[in-house]
Amino acid sequence: MSNKKVQSPKEESIAKMLICKVHIGTKNLENKMKRYVYTRAKDGVHIINLAKTYEKLQLAARVIVAVSNPADVVVVSARPFGSRAVLKFAQYTGAQAIAGRWTPGMLTNQIIQKFIEPRLLIVTDPRTDAQSVKESAYANIPVIALCDSDSPLEHVDIAIPCNNKGKESIALMYWLLAQEVLYLKGTIPRSQAWDVMVDMFLWRDPEQFELKNLANEEATPTAPHLADNQYATEAPYDDWNKKDDWNDNANEEWKNPITVDEW
């Protein structure tokens, strides 16, 4: 009989967080983020308490599920590492994703074409997504944010303490959040593991794909290159002057009339 201990969902999620370095904070510490910091390493980096990260993740998922229309939830990421994660989160939960630059006035200026009226806003980083967080305060829209140890908590209603600068950490946090939302909605039972891998939420550099394609093209065998002067030599014409190669009686045969019997 195996003595392997079966991990609870909380232990399994925290183990994944450790692998993706969700607990690694920064050397700077925001005063309001002290409650989420477990300790400080010798190199000055603050270590985030993953137990509180898991609790805030569960709370955020319940708030997202409470919104009746999933399209009223907007997920924002101005940071490139979070662009693929927010798009995948929106794909599986039905939310709206805004990856890249935030157009000023999307929540406050009704004249612009991109004006939206969401009921909930999720941001990847309150610092890089400061414009959207500020506009949500004007429009009275609650905000859920992935907050590092140095992130400002102004106008943030639910802060999920985590490393919001690493691409593995961002991908895992959105994957866990999407998984919990699907569990609460009943889309997938809790007894069943989600068949979507975390790699689907992971950001990939387009330049790496181009370099990989170039390497594959160089490794592909090609036809041997022919020299430019290979076909530049003249064909031999001495044999054309020999009369033996020609039939001298050809002209006389052509002059003979064709009879009907031959047809």
UniProtKB/Swiss-Prot annotation:
<keyword id="KW-0689">Ribosomal protein</keyword>
<keyword id="KW-0963">Cytoplasm</keyword>
<dbReference type="GO" id="GO:0006412">
    <property type="term" value="P:translation"/>
</dbReference>
<comment type="function">
    <text>Required for the assembly and/or stability of the 40S ribosomal subunit. Required for the processing of the 20S rRNA-precursor to mature 18S rRNA in a late step of the maturation of 40S ribosomal subunits.</text>
</comment>
<protein>
    <recommendedName>
        <fullName>Small ribosomal subunit protein uS2</fullName>
    </recommendedName>
</protein>
<dbReference type="InterPro" id="IPR001865">
    <property type="entry name" value="Ribosomal_uS2"/>
</dbReference>
<dbReference type="Pfam" id="PF00318">
    <property type="entry name" value="Ribosomal_S2"/>
</dbReference>
<dbReference type="GO" id="GO:0000028">
    <property type="term" value="P:ribosomal small subunit assembly"/>
</dbReference>
<keyword id="KW-0687">Ribonucleoprotein</keyword>
<feature type="region of interest" description="Disordered">
    <location>
        <begin position="237"/>
        <end position="263"/>
    </location>
</feature>
<dbReference type="InterPro" id="IPR005707">
    <property type="entry name" value="Ribosomal_uS2_euk/arc"/>
</dbReference>
<dbReference type="InterPro" id="IPR018130">
    <property type="entry name" value="Ribosomal_uS2_CS"/>
</dbReference>
<comment type="similarity">
    <text>Belongs to the universal ribosomal protein uS2 family.</text>
</comment>
<dbReference type="InterPro" id="IPR027498">
    <property type="entry name" value="Ribosomal_uS2_euk"/>
</dbReference>
<dbReference type="GO" id="GO:0003735">
    <property type="term" value="F:structural constituent of ribosome"/>
</dbReference>
<dbReference type="InterPro" id="IPR023591">
    <property type="entry name" value="Ribosomal_uS2_flav_dom_sf"/>
</dbReference>
<dbReference type="GO" id="GO:0022627">
    <property type="term" value="C:cytosolic small ribosomal subunit"/>
</dbReference>
<comment type="subunit">
    <text>Component of the small ribosomal subunit. Mature ribosomes consist of a small (40S) and a large (60S) subunit. The 40S subunit contains about 33 different proteins and 1 molecule of RNA (18S). The 60S subunit contains about 49 different proteins and 3 molecules of RNA (25S, 5.8S and 5S). Interacts with ribosomal protein S21.</text>
</comment>
